[in-house]
Amino acid sequence: MKLRVFFDNNTSPVLAETVGGYLKHLGHRADHIRDLPCGRHASDIEWMEFLASTSDEWLTVTGDARIQKNKAERAAFRKAGLKGIVLANAYQKTPINRQASFLIWRWPEIQALTKLAPPFLFEVPMRNSSGIRQLPI
């Protein structure tokens, strides 16, 4: 099944487009929130509801770990049955080209996670030596 990778407002549109170029050759697609009907100004709960309303298989990418701490957002994420990865804080301090190359480098690990039953949230660290770790959702 074709996977759609959703990048929220806590990620750069350039990151979504760059990773999207790689994903396209695998038969997948990347979308930044600015390009979806819900729009760039949608709240986290609004975009979660939008993704759940489609028949697509989504993997969300965010730089905002608060999804797991905010009760309403956590409940909406679970209700929507979403799969997600959180980029560790170090991503925010890293140039876009390195963010993209690191996500692409780790893509086989990330794609393996998509086979797990939703909902789930994993943190992807910025270091090669660190493993991807599951976050409570």
Where are these regions (language model features)?
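Active-site-proximal, substrate-binding regions of enzyme catalytic domains
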Residues: 1-45, 66-70, 92
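A general structural motif
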Residues: 2, 57, 117-119
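Short, surface-exposed basic-aromatic patches at helix termini and helix-loop junctions that form
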Residues: 21-24, 75-81
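Conserved beta-strand termini and adjacent loop/short-helix elements that scaffold enzyme active sites
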Residues: 33-35, 87, 124-125
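Acidic, metal-binding active-site segment of PIN/NYN-like and related structure-specific nucleases
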Residues: 44, 51-74
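Ser/Thr/Gly-rich flexible loops in soluble cytosolic domains mediating phosphotransfer, phosphorylation
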Residues: 80-114
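Charged phosphate-binding loop/patch that engages nucleotide di/tri-phosphates or the phosphate backbone
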Residues: 110-137
